[in-house]
Amino acid sequence: MDITKGSLDEIARPASSSRSRPGSRVSTSLSTEKPKRSSTSLSLEILNPEPGFSEMPSQLCLGLETCETHLEAGRKTPIEHHDQLLGQKHFSKNSAEDYECHRRDEINFDHPFPQKEIDLLSHESEDEFLDLPSAEFEDACENDEDPKDDQDIADDKAIDPKMERAIKRMQALDDILQRKLAKEKEVKAQGLEIRIKLWEELQRATIQSSARSHEENMNTSKFLALTPQLDEMEDAASVQMCNIFSPVFPTQLPNEDPVEDDDHKTLQGNMTGADSSDRSDCKTRHSKGQKKEVDFIQRNIELAKDAGAYILLMDDEKLRLEQLLEDIQEGCSDEDITGDVSGWIVPGEGYTPEPDEYDQLAEIDSRLQMVRCSEESLETSLSDSRILKEVFQEVLLEKNGNSDSAPGEQVLRNTKELRDQKMRLREIDQQLQDMERNSITPMSLVSRYSFSADSPVYA
């Protein structure tokens, strides 16, 4: 390896310092060696390239150089960066040998760092640049060299009409959303105000209810104490009904206990007393009634014995029925009940007419039947004559045409018939009264009645 010495007056700072990373060995060594650099004279040592490095293509070398220029462009002004780009273009026209010479002039100087650290740093930088493709370096160079045209800028600034419509629609929707949000805020504020008012009214109501006087509370408590409970009223009514009505055939065994009468009397006496004593008596009576209830299971067993009978009766009911039937049998026997009616008439008992009187009675009976028949025939003849007379009169009126001249003639006829009937009834009543007064014999009555029947009666 050849070493060439030279001065570093034209170089402001070493190239390796720009690539140093914070925390690395190079940066730490730089911070420790600063006073030494100020005291010693700067020198540059140029080393011959290694055999593998000289065979690299020219494009990769140009890419490495452009990458270095990009890193340094951030620390330079635009004018300095433009001058550097012009120098790079002029330098790209030279061959690879000129590039190697220029590389030696920049790197080969007396550096205060050890040779091992410099070699490690160079290897790391070469590996990083080798990983990057050459196309990226060429695109970067073209972007730096070729400025944008005015037409491209105008195309970028142009806005699609669809985008404009979408933007307008978004703005309209934003306005609607803002209005909805404002309305929602107003509704929430109103709801909060209403809740506050309701809470205030509730507090006022509670204060007013708690501010009632002691006298009002006492009156209400007394009124509620006077009102009886429904269950107690029903119990009292049921007890009274049971005491008033006693069934002939009770379906359950009677409670033969004088305690119930005592309870009923105490109930009537305590109705005028205090309400508290009344309630206590009702409760005790109700509890006693529950204890004295009849066992309905035993009652059902007794009823099941006579399940085939037409009427189900208890043992007590059967005994009572037998007693009643015995009393009836003692009063009258079955023979008297089922005997012939003709046996009731016994000769020598009651009224027994003599044979002459018996013949007279038979004659009277026959004459009465004859009178009845004559009466019926007379009534029928009279009715027929009246009907014929009425028909004859109606026919005459129709012929003469005087029906309209006498409208009340029918009423007069009816009244006359009623008068005649009343006269007959009076005569019959008068005859009966005379019979009762004078005790007229049946024969004279029959003769008189027959005489009156034989006489003509005109309506």
Swiss-Prot record:
UniProtKB keywords: Coiled coil
Compositional bias annotation for Basic and acidic residues: 276-289
Coiled coil: 162-202
Presence of keyword Coiled coil: yes
Biased composition (Low complexity): 13-29
Disulphide-bridged cysteine pairs: none
Name of a matching Pfam family: FSIP1
Keyword NAD: no
Disordered: region residues: 1-54, 252-289
InterPro entries: Fsip1
UniProt family annotation: Belongs to the FSIP1 family.
The protein, known as: Fibrous sheath-interacting protein 1
Organism, as annotated: Xenopus laevis
Gene name in the database record: fsip1
